[in-house]
Each structure stands twice: as structure tokens, then as C-alpha cells.
Amino acid sequence: MIKTIKTMSKQEKERYTVPRKVQDVIPVRRIWPDGTFLVGNKFSKTYKFSDINYLVASREDKESMFLTYSELLNSLDSGAVTKITINNRRMNQANFETSILMPMQGDFRDEYRGEYNQMLLDKATGANGIMQEKYITISVVKKDIEEARAYFSRVGADLISHFAALGSKCVELDATERLRILHDFYRQGEESEFVFNAREMMKRGHSFKDYICPDGIEKNSDYLKLGGKFCRVLFLKDYASYIKDNMVTELTDFNRNLMFSIDIVPVPTDEAVREVENRLLGVETNITNWQRRQNANNNFSAVVPYDMELQRKESKEFLDDLTTRDQRMMFAVMTLAITADTKEQLDSDTEAVLSVARKHMCQLAVLKFQQLDGLNTALPIGARKINAFRTLTTESLAVFIPFKVQEIQDKGGIYFGENAISHNLIMCNKANLLNQSAFLLGVPGAGKSFSAKELIAFLMLHPDYANDDILICDPEGEFGALVKALGREKATVAHLVAGGKDRLNAMYMVEGYGEQNPIVEKSQFVMSLIEQIDKRGVGPQHKSIIDRCTALVYPEAEKSGRVATLCDLRQKLLEQPEDKAKEIALSLELYTTGSLDIFGRESTVDLNKPYVVFDIHGLGEQLKPAGSLVITDTILNRVTLNWKRGKRTHVFIDEFHVMFENEQSGIFFNSAWRQFRKRGAYPTAITQNVEYLLDSVQASTMLSNSEFIVMLNQAASDRAKLAKLLNISNEQMSYVTNADAGCGLIRYGSALVPFVNRFPRDTKLYALMTTKPGEGVFGGEEVPA
């Protein structure tokens, strides 16, 4: 026997005591608040690591992940036992519903909340409702807790850095979190009842095991009964010569509570080489003896038997792996604990798991009369009671890679669809991100407007966002009906058309406007506006004149107790001696005294309501860019006011690419976007012309710096540019290639998740949100009763 195994067996040897109560079955002797457990003679510590997008990665990325994971395995300490665990945990239905459903408020919106909640429940029922959590547990023999803590501190830092290289976040679990894992497994269906307070426990003289153990454990030869649940533990008995990297994914892809664990015992390389050399020497000796016997029988041409030749070949390959390919010898035990409500269900699930193993040419077997030992081995406690070791190299062990696909299920998150791979709900809380900037990208008909409206509906209906303001720049007149239906008296829909009654003052400026000098910022805005009006652009002389006049207009208006307007600016321009000032004044004439004076005089729109839609559909294509610019400036004023009041603002800007058609408007909008972020706003840009966006350095920088991007179906040229800018693989980009409406990719922080989002058509919300002719309610139409 290898020295490492001999030493480990000696260390793990415990005196067996007959358990007198259920608590005695749990092999943890003592716990510390930092999450260190004493299990037998060993100290153990558990770390939780997040999933990464392995299944949807390209072949090159998969190889890179595989090699990085191999490095992690190679870094494991040979003096400790490492356990990698995948925990399929069913979400508690009551907790789940509380976390995702909107509470009713007793107002007219409850009908819409009911529709939205029913949609969420239908999706949740269709989803498997299983949360997959992944842990790595280190167990080591140390003299005392101080030595153990020092060891775990060093090993933990090493693990965190290795997982970070994979793109996975690794965090250590404290005692409460580790006990919760055990409680949720032992007492399934009672997850919400877990309460653990170490101080109270000691005060009452209780054991920590009292808070996690099942009501009873019945032992049978091939299954256990934990309280009212049935449990069976299997182990991997026989391995195939070649195993695919998706075996672990398929084994754990069950809509059931289960624990899959791999116990790893690394062997020091010098010891491993010595062992393999001894084995090879034994094989060579056997071959020599066989040949000597053949020669004695005058059989000088005999061929060495196949099994001996195979042993020699495999031993040489193994030795070569250890000495020249930086592989390590590992001993591994794989256990799988599955649970069910009935014995029949347990038998059915067992057969399903066995068939998955057979598909991969492996053999899983049920542990006979060792079920309790198997359970303690499968759980992330740090115990190992099963000795069904298999000798593997680092590479062959790395094939059992535990990664699948990233999930986004934030507490207090907003629904954005279902994960296209795991079918779990995607719940995003943008407050958790580094910045709250968002982009909705897609070709016409891909579902951009619908996605934006669905988000707006959620914000207007959910009580958590009741105090937030929503401001929408609406170039196509698509959002008014929805906002009016859900907002009623709290909503303003401003229809900005030539000669209309709704007006906006382009020169309006609140206190605190801009990042530094408000006059300079407003001057920049006016330059952008004139550039939109006069396509010849704004030269250096024009800029000087505009800057001078803007600085003069505001103090004069303030003295007379009025609000400065574009009419005042035009008048001031006419007073200037330069001819170019007269040119600028002439450009502004149409917007001040002409037929398009809706931005030249004092505002008539009620901007104090929480929900405001700026509908510029009637402006025409020529004037929309200027209208979008004025609206952005108006929104910036409102965001600044809300920021001072401690209020959050959600900003939606459709046809976003228009802002970057000219240099000055691009500079102004880049500054405005930056201020949105700094002043507590959640800006969302919506566009179908991704190519225009990416041609602008400023716009592409804004896009790449955004933490939240929803990519729906993309045109071929846009796909290539997006993939390059956001570093997305071809496999991942396939989800935005000829995708159905409402399907695509979400980039959420560092996560990249394919999603499917389909809303039920037989609802009033759908009629308010869809833009399909004949199905939806649009700006000028009657809202359904």
C-alpha cells in the first residue's frame, strides 16, 4: 500500500461507538464560528465557489478552463483530503414565491400584478426549481485549532486565486452557513425554519446538532430514511477508459435534491514515481520470467502476451505522465446521495442515475450496508468513510469538471427571462453591479421595445420601486399607452409636435446642473443643439459666441425673475456685433419664433409626476435628433433634482444611436450618461443600429463599460463587432444568431447567460407591451378596460 494512503487511514481510524441518538450519527465533534469543524481527528473547512459558463464556451475556451482546473487540482496539498461537492438544492416554494412575487397593494394595478405573478408562477413551475451550489472542503490533521486556522488561511487564499483564474468566485463559509447546508439536506422542505444562534445555543445548553439533525434515521441495507424522506447513496465503482467532460453535468442534472462528492487524496510526486517504477519493475520481471520459461521449452519466437504488454505500456505511460507532463497521482472516491419522497420514486431515480453512468461506460453501484458511511462521505463535512479508491492522474480527474452554466438569481431582482440551459428564472438586481448602465440591443422585431416595456411594467407595479421615478425618451410613440395605463394620474405623456400645446424649455437649468460649471455645461448643450439644427457644424468662432451669450442670458433672466429660454438666447445673439452671431440666431429662428417653437419658450409639461414619457413621434425624422437632445437635457435636470432628494430615477432612451451622429451631441450625451450614473439614475439605452453605435469611440466605450447588456437577435455585421468588443465566443454568439423574438444573451457583470423570455399573450399586460400590429395598444388608442 502507498505510504500516503497508509498514513491517511491511520489518521482517520476512529474508535467506533454505537450511536444512541440521531445526533450521534453526524460525525462532527465540534464547531467554531469561523466555519472550522472538527470531524474525527481532522479539522475541516468549506469554501463555496460559483459556476462558470463551461457548457456554452468555445472549444478553445473549454481547453483553457480544463487546463486551469487541472492547475487547481495540481495545487492541492498532499497532506490534506479535498472534497469537491455539487449540491442540488430545491428552493423552498413558500420562500421562492415570497422572493419573486409582487405583493398586492389594494389599488387598480393589482389586476396587472396578478397577471405578472401568474406568469412568474407558470415559469417557475416549468423551471426545475433546483439551485445548484458547489463547495470545496479541505480536511487536515493538525495539532490544535490555531494551527488549523493558519493552514486554512494559507490554503484558502490559494484556492480563491485559482478559482479567480477560472472566472469563479470562491468564498469561505462560516459555521452558520455550513450548518444550513446540512440542515437543508437532513430536513428537506423545512429550509425556512433553520435558525442558529451560537450564543443562545450555549445559554440553553443545546448541541449544534439539535438544530440540523433529522427527526429520525432508519437504516436499511441499500437506503436510508431521513425523517420522512428516502435517501440512497451510490458510488462510482468502475470507470470507462475514456470519459466525456459532461459526465458530472449529466449525473447532477436531475430535478431532485442530491449531493455528488469527489474525495481527492493527492500523492507526493516522488512517492508516486517510486510506486509506479516498482509496478513497472514487477511487470518487466513477469515478462522476463515468462520469456525464460518459453526459452526453456525451446520456444524462441513466442510473442509476449497481450495483457502483459498492455500492463507495461500503461505503466510506462503513467510514469511518463508523472515525470514529463507535470501530472500528479490522485486517489479519488466518488459518491452520490439522492433523495426522494417515496421508496418507489427513489428506485426510479436510482435507475435513471445508473443509466446516465452506463451511457458514459461507467458503473455506479449502490452501497450495501454502508449507506450511513456513504452519506457522511457525500456531505460536505470533511469525513471519508468509503475506501473505494481509484488511481487517477490530474488530467483524468479533471475530466470530472464540476462547472456547467452561470445562474443569475439575485435577491430582490427583476425577472428577465429563463436561463436557456438550466431553465431557471433569471432575476437581476442591478444595484449589485459596479454601475447600473444598461443597453438593449437587437434588430427590428427582436423584442427590444417589449423587453424595455416589461422592465418598465415591473418597476411601476412592484412596491419596492414605488418611490422611484421613470423618465422615457420615446421617438416612436410606443411607451405612452403602457405608462398611462399603469400610472394614470401619476403619469405625464408629453406629445411634442410642431404647433402642439406641450412645450419643453431647452434652456431650463436646475441648481447643481452639470458636473462642474453649469454655464459651461449648458453652453456645450446649446452647441450640440445647434449642430443638430445646422448640419454644417459648429466652428471655433461659433463656439466662442455661443459660450459668451449663454453666460450672459442666465444672470439677466435671474434678475428679472424669469426662466431663461431659447428666445432670450436668440435675442442676445442678435445683439452681438459678429455676423456669425446673426447666422446662429437665424438657425434658432425656427425653434424660437417659428413653427417649431416647442423648445424655445417656457415649459408647459408637468414634469413633477413620477412617470414621464416624452413622445416625439410627431416631430418627423429631421427634428427627432434635436428633440432627443432637449429631452436628454430635461431628464438630466430631473435626475439632478431627484439625486438631491435621495430619489432613484430610471431613464430609458430609445433610438440611442441618433445621439452620436454628430460630434458635439456625442460629447454632450457622453457627459450626460456619466452624470446619470453618478446621480443615482439607472440609465437604459435602446437601439437597433449597433453598427452606428460601435462606429463612435464614445458610444462603444459606454457600451463596453456597461455592466448590464441585453443582446437580442443581431445582424451578422453587428455580431462580429459585438463579439470582438465584449469578448464573446462563437458558441455564445449563436444565441443571438437568428434568435426568436425575446431570446438572446444577457451580460450581467462578468456573467454571460443565454436566455428565453416569452410573455403570455392572453393578458392585458401583453396588449400594452407588444408592438405587433393588431395585437397591441399604441399611443393614441384606448387603453383596455
Stretches with model-predicted labels:
Residues 488-494, 698-711:
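A short helix-turn-beta junction within AAA+ P-loop NTPase domains corresponding to the substrate/partner-engaging
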Residues 432, 444:
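The conserved Walker
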Residues 448:
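Conserved lysine of the Walker
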Residues 440:
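Hydrophobic anchor at the beta1->P-loop junction of P-loop NTPases
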Residues 52, 59-78, 85, 89, ...:
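P-loop NTPase motor domains
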Residues 451:
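Hydrophobic positions on the alpha1 helix immediately C-terminal to the Walker A/P-loop
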Residues 1-402:
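Extended, folded cores of ATP/NTP-driven motor/assembly subunits in large transport
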Residues 458-471, 489-491:
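Post-Walker A helix-loop "phosphate-sensing" segment adjacent to the P-loop in P-loop NTPases
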